[in-house]
Design a protein with these regions (language model features):
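Secretory/organelle targeting and membrane-embedding segments
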Residues: 2-174, 178-520
Length: 520
């Protein structure tokens, strides 16, 4: 048998970077940003485009068309954009790249509800395409309030700007929230599908722009050691946490109509559940992956009204101390009613009714002004049999735990038991940890780079389909109904800077089941 050949240090990284598929540029196109002068565009989208340009993924030629009601011209918008890039880019942007992006940016002023705005946009798109030798490939990013989603799509259709013809494509990117309940989500889907085919609609979830989330597919299906034990025989339970230290800040008006459940669970958290629990797809084709995700969402058991009372917890933060600073209660935030019953914390215990996950609880938790900022997936395995250790000082065997951290630092850690050095048998817990930044280096990212790139190449894998959106809302409909029918009597019920209401921790019964974040 020949000797094993070790790869030279750094060889894996170099092969990943140089692989042709990774260097595929997006299709030449014009990105139309409705709400192009707003915060999302300034802080996330434009910096993400700068990063794509520096990494060599932005198509050439490429142009931006911003559409807003602000009293600006193309020249004044370009000046503002230059300053915004300097302010919000995650690192200094190469001057030549910044200049090229700014020079290929154009501006249309108009009301989103005015048909003349779309005629003006149509004319400008034609001019820019001719001037810059661009095909008529357009993707429209709706960085606007949800009330404009249907209106803008209807107007695009009426102006002939949504129709795909002569080999050119049209795509529409829609931000969350996609509806505020099952009824409104269905209505919005029906409205936009009168204009667009499903393959043209990209319902974006920026959580899926995180490398660790995308790595779930590689981690599960690209390694022979994990998938065989990824089922009810070996896993005790799964905890998915999205904890934020920030409060609602200046978004009190929006949050009053949303709350933590609507804001985070049917989109962000259910996407993480579906990627964690899905069956292997037949390929990495977008619909093959999303078919399996949709099966998980449809298999999630909706809670009965009685189960809502025992398997959900809601909370609202009171005044408290965070990072050594006093912070106000939710009811004292701007644009929040002083008697508000809106929840800023939500926790649920759910089950997936299929062969792989039958009887395994999934604990979901999200909240504002919690003790630590962390988004993670924690898989706790079943404990080993204790018989062998009955005559030793070991009192219990701690369960193995796999923790996939999405933010703030992207990492994967596996904890397992090891003997503590010494003459007697004692168990300690040790960790094997992989940190993305340590191995691959730390590249600046807004979380939108991969998603924008996928829009340009037409890969919808990381975007939700209509059936996925509606399935997510279906699961929480009973929770919304019960919570609305029974206003909370104990709000506020957790201090800012803590881990939320104590009832959330009490949902984790049984030996070894503890709140993952509190234990970390």
């Amino acid at each position: 048998m020949g000797e094993a050949q070790l790869l030279p240090e750094g060889d894996v990284k170099s092969r990943i970077v140089k692989s042709p598929i990774w260097k595929r540029k997006g299709d030449p196109c014009i990105m139309v940003i409705f709400g192009g002068a707003g915060d999302l565009s300034k802080r996330k989208l434009i910096p993400a485009l700068c990063n794509l340009a520096e990494q060599g993924f932005l198509p050439q030629p490429f142009a931006i068309m911003a559409v807003t009601y602000s009293d600006l011209t193309t020249e004044t918008f370009r000046q503002q954009m230059t300053e915004d890039i300097k302010t919000f880019a995650l690192r200094p942007v190469d001057a030549a790249i910044r200049q090229r992006l700014v020079e290929h940016t154009h501006y249309v002023r108009g009301d989103f509800a005015d048909p003349d705005t779309y005629e003006q946009l149509k004319a400008r798109l034609g001019e820019v395409a001719n001037q810059e030798n661009l095909p008529a490939n357009y993707f429209y990013y709706l960085a606007v309030a949800p009330r404009f989603f249907g209106e803008i799509v209807r107007r695009l259709g009426a102006a002939g700007l949504a129709r795909e013809e002569n080999g050119c494509w049209r795509r529409v990117v829609i931000e969350k929230p996609f509806g505020r309940d099952l009824h409104s989500a269905r209505a919005l889907n029906a409205e936009i599908k009168q204009v667009l085919d499903e393959h043209q609609i990209y319902r974006i979830d920026h959580y899926l722009g995180k490398e660790t989330v995308q790595n779930l597919l590689m981690f599960r299906f690209g390694n022979g050691i994990f998938e065989p034990i990824w089922n009810r025989r070996y896993i005790d339970h799964v905890q998915i946490t999205a904890a934020e230290t920030v409060g609602v800040e200046q978004r009190g008006g929006y949050y009053e109509t949303s709350g933590a459940l609507r804001d985070m669970v049917p989109n962000h958290l259910f996407q993480l559940v579906s990627l964690t629990a899905m069956e292997p797809p037949i390929s990495f084709d977008a619909n093959a992956v999303r078919d399996e995700q949709a099966k998980i969402l449809h298999a999630m058991q909706a809670l009965s009204p009685e189960e809502v009372l025992s398997k959900t917890v809601r909370g609202q933060y009171d005044a408290g101390v965070l990072a050594g600073k006093q912070v106000p209660a939710y009811r004292a935030e701007p644009n929040v009613r002083p008697d508000s019953s809106t929840e800023t914390f939500a926790a649920l215990k759910l089950f997936i009714d299929n062969w792989r996950w039958s009887g395994i609880p999934f604990y979901l938790r999200t909240g504002k002004h919690l003790a630590r900022r962390v988004t993670e997936i924690s898989i706790q395995f079943r404990s080993a049999p204790f018989q062998l250790f009955r005559s030793t000082p070991v009192e219990t065997l701690r369960a193995n735990r796999l923790v996939i951290t999405i933010q703030p630092e992207e990492s994967i850690a596996l904890s397992f038991g090891a003997k503590v050095p010494g003459p007697i048998m004692q168990q300690g817990t040790v960790d094997m940890c992989f940190n993305y930044a340590d191995y691959f280096g730390s590249a600046p990212s807004t979380g939108y780079e991969r998603l924008l790139y996928d829009c340009m190449i037409g890969d919808a894998t990381l975007f939700q389909r209509a059936d996925m959106v509606e399935a997510g809302w279906s699961v929480i409909t009973s929770v919304l109904d019960v919570w609305q029918a029974l206003p909370p009597r104990d709000f506020p019920n957790y201090a800012a800077g803590t881990w939320g209401p104590k009832e959330a921790q009490e949902m984790l019964p049984g030996t070894g089941r503890e709140g993952r974040a509190q234990a970390a």
